[in-house]
Amino acid sequence: MKPFTLPRWRFTNCCGHHWGHPAKPAAAEGATRREFFKTAAVTAAGLAALASEVKSAAAQGRVFPPPPPSVSPIEGLIDFHTHCAPDAFGRAVDDDESAQAYMARKAEAVVLKNHFALTADRAWLVRKHVPGIKAFGGVALNGPSGGINAEAVQWMWRMQGGFGRVVWLPTFDADNHVKHFKDAPEGIKVVGADGKALPAVRDVLKVCAQQKLVACTGHASPTEALAIIEAARDAGCDRIVVTHAEFEVVNMSVEQMKKAASMGAKLEIDALGVLMGPQAHLPFMRHWRHVSYKESAGHIKEIGAQNFVLGTDLGQTGNPSQPDGYAMLVSGLMAEGINREQIITMGREVPGKLLMG
């Protein structure tokens, strides 16, 4: 193998002395001219290709992810619907980790939801461990809580700290849910044969009215949710939310949303919606219909931002973090024509009044 040599220029001064790299044997004049033109052609082609690449790169714009935003897109907002460990289902983070992540993004508050266990006590612990953020909890009236159980609600709001502010009517155990997904022959009913809210539901709503708790419709059908809203008004409960109104099992029409809003209910929009559908990366989410940002933005424009509340419904193992999901929801809605003022209304003002008003 020949040793590596680096070619250098050879200089000759006016006296004929040489220095630099030894000269190669002189080539014939014709060969020298051919090599010159060959080299020039190759160089010109290379420069042209380089110029083309530079122009192409310029046309493509940035090739790196954008820098972190100077202002957090979720600063001051409230996530009205989070799921954390410990739970019966796989959760990516626990309550404290979720709160810390939200505090780092300058969010205002989080609502801790669990389908099977109380979260009013967990909210107190989060506030103790992560004092920079407000945490709220509540109770979901599924089987483990005794179903539609006013007594469970009474003890929930009495939990130390007073941070148990939300009551979810049946979710996974709801009659509408189990029949829709064929999980069981029947579940916990919220309305009778006459289509009216059952007495047990009315008892729960009376407690919500007395203690200024937020009543959420859970996984009730659209017609059931409207019956619950009517019963809430009769009971004097003016803090009522249609749980993820756009999602599968609930899936209200625009007209039903308008009616619910006219009766004083707020409609929940969640970041999880855009991740669901046949294209979902997690198998369980393929059974729920896809809700696009465009669809949600259309509902906001038609019904009014003052009638909506934002959340994520995130926390599942394998899904985006709750703060990232919330930021995606905000940017997705704004890309569809929703302005920052409307985001503040839905993400801060409306849930703030429900929880702390």
Describe the predicted segments one by one.
Residues 1-32, 58:
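N-terminal secretory signal peptides
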Residues 9, 15, 37-50, 323-357:
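Mid-to-C-terminal alpha-helical segments outside catalytic/metal-binding sites
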Residues 25, 29-38, 46-63:
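N-terminal twin-arginine translocation
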Residues 36-37, 60-134:
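An N-terminally biased module of ancient metal coordination in phosphate/nucleic-acid-related enzymes
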Residues 40-41, 64-69, 95-100, 120-125, ...:
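Histidine/acidic residue-rich metal-binding segments in metalloenzymes
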Residues 78-82, 110-112, 136-139, 167-169, ...:
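Hydrophobic faces of well-ordered beta-strands that scaffold small-molecule active sites
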Residues 83-85, 115, 138-144, 170-174, ...:
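Active-site beta-loop-alpha junctions enriched in small/polar residues
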Residues 270, 303-322:
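Short acidic/histidine-rich active-site segments
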